Each structure stands twice: as structure tokens, then as C-alpha cells.
């Protein structure tokens, strides 16, 4: 009986509220997006995606989303320049 009362004290956790605190290393972003490290390096430079870290690049969730949007656009046939532009516009539209 005491167990049920303790469980009743808990509320559901919305992980989406905490995603802004999550950061991923380069290799993790590559696995998540399904791209190579060489691609990610190139895209990061071309799209000027901000990263943290000195020895290893660290990507916040905004950067990860940008990478995944670029990947999605490339998978749909856009060249890299157009994919970067599409990702930027998509993110800008969300915040208007």
C-alpha cells in the first residue's frame, strides 16, 4: 500500500522540455543522422553550424536538427547548397 502512495507522488516527465540541455559528440551526431564524419565535418564548415569543444566537436540540439534537416533535403535530391538553404529557411519559419 505504501508503494502505491509513493508512485502517486510522481508526475510524467516531458523530455522535450530538457532537450536544450543535451549535447552530442561528432560520432553520435553521425550515427543519428546516418552520415560519415567526413560529411559532417564538411557540412559543419559549409553551413557554418556552431559547435563547442576544442579537442572534440560538440553539437547542441539546434545544430543536430540542422544537420538532420540537411540530410533530409539531400535525401530528397537537393544539392548541398540548396539543402543548407532549405534547412535554414525551415528553421526560420518555425520561429516566425
Residues covered by each model-derived region:
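Arg/Lys-rich, alpha-helical DNA-contact motif
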Residues: 1-31, 45-50, 61-96
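Key DNA-contact positions within bacterial/archaeal DNA-binding proteins
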Residues: 38
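Short, Lys/Arg-rich nucleic-acid/phosphate-binding segment
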Residues: 53-58
Amino acid at each position: 500500500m505504501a508503494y502505491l502512495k509513493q508512485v502517486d507522488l510522481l508526475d510524467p516527465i516531458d523530455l522535450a522540455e530538457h532537450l536544450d540541455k543535451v549535447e552530442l559528440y561528432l560520432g553520435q551526431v553521425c550515427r543519428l543522422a546516418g552520415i560519415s564524419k567526413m560529411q559532417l565535418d564538411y557540412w559543419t564548415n559549409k553551413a557554418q553550424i556552431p559547435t563547442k569543444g576544442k579537442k572534440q566537436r560538440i553539437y547542441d540540439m539546434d545544430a543536430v536538427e540542422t544537420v538532420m534537416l540537411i540530410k533530409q533535403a539531400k535525401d530528397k535530391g537537393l544539392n548541398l547548397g540548396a539543402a543548407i538553404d532549405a534547412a535554414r529557411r525551415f528553421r526560420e519559419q518555425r520561429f516566425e
